[in-house]
């Protein structure tokens, strides 16, 4: 319910901003309506399709192997732990997969809470204790329970719509100003002005949109850490994050890394990082932030 309320409030805020900006453009309302529909379709379609295909894409990206029947004690423990945590959180047990990677990592994805996927790297299973791995799994279960994949899709769709819509409104406004200031109304020139202007603006606004989506992504990591601490204990979650500091740099592809518990490590351009630093996440748990 809170996710839907947040979505509606965000949309309302976006519409208000649109209305304020458009009041200065003098562009006909019918053009605005068509452009808004166009922007919404293109803004949300890519995000929604990616969400619906996320499990298949994720498994293909990491060459993950779904566990249908456990072949060893570790796989049996993995299934039992995820089953237990899923019941506690009131969701169906996700599909469980293992993929080969030297880095310690795991991720959750899927369009629905009751039809999700959790994949765990061999590096994590080989290097973490059961307590630490349990905390990582609880982190991923909380992502699923919180509906984070859907929330990120909604956020991405909204900012995509905003980028497309505002870019084309400003480009259309610039093109109309140019045609008014020239005696010869060259339609080809105006069209090129519109295309070039809208393309440049989409690139610029796209950068700011990335900052917004990455801010949401970083905050959902804090909440998933806190949820894991509530489920299995703060000590286990802190220990897991400390162990991740010893991991190889994550090797997962860019379309997967945002879903992983262990994101890319960088001290440069933190605004564009999908994950907070491990030190900040550990400190947040010590301070009981987000709990």
Swiss-Prot record:
EC class of the enzyme, as a word: hydrolase
Main location: membrane
UniProt GO cellular component terms: plasma membrane
Cofactor details (free text): Binds 1 zinc ion per subunit.
Membrane topology type: Multi-pass membrane protein
Record has ATP-binding as a keyword: no
TM stretches of this protein: 4-24, 32-52, 158-178, 192-212
Keywords on record: Cell membrane, Hydrolase, Membrane, Metal-binding, Metalloprotease, Protease, Transmembrane, Transmembrane helix, Zinc
Pfam families: Peptidase_M48
Record localization: Cell membrane
Residue positions of the active site: 140
EC number(s) per entry: 3.4.24.-
BP terms from Gene Ontology: proteolysis
Domain of life where this protein originates: Bacteria
Necessary cofactors: Zn(2+)
Family according to the record: Belongs to the peptidase M48B family.
UniProt-recorded name of the protein: Protease HtpX
Annotated organism of origin: Buchnera aphidicola subsp. Baizongia pistaciae (strain Bp)
């Amino acid at each position: 319910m809170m996710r839907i309320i947040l979505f509606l409030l965000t949309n309302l805020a976006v519409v208000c901003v649109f209305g304020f900006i458009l009041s200065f453009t003098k562009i006909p309302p019918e053009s605005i309506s068509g452009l808004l529909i166009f922007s919404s379709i293109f803004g949300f379609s890519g995000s929604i399709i990616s969400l619906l295909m996320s499990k298949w894409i994720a498994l293909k990206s990491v060459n993950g192997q779904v566990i249908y029947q456990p072949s060893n004690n570790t796989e049996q423990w993995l299934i039992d732990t995820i089953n237990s945590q899923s019941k506690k959180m009131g969701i169906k047990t996700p599909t469980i997969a293992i993929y080969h990677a030297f880095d310690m990592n795991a991720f959750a994805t899927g369009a629905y809470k009751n039809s999700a996927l959790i994949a765990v790297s061999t590096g994590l299973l080989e290097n973490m204790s059961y307590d630490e791995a349990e905390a990582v799994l609880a982190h991923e279960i909380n992502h699923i329970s919180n509906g984070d994949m859907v929330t990120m899709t909604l956020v991405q769709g909204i900012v995509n719509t905003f980028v497309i819509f505002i870019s084309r409104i400003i480009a259309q406004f610039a093109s109309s100003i140019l045609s008014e200031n020239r005696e010869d109304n060259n339609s080809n020139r105006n069209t090129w002005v519109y295309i070039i202007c809208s393309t440049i603006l989409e690139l610029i606004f796209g950068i700011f949109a990335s900052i917004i989506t990455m801010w949401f992504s970083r905050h959902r990591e804090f909440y998933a850490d806190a949820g894991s601490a509530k489920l299995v204990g703060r000590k286990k979650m802190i220990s897991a994050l400390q162990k991740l500091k010893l991991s190889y740099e994550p090797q997962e592809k860019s379309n997967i890394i945002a879903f992983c518990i262990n994101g890319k490590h960088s001290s440069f351009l933190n605004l564009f990082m999908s994950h907070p630093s491990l030190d900040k996440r550990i400190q947040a748990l010590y301070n009981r932030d987000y709990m």
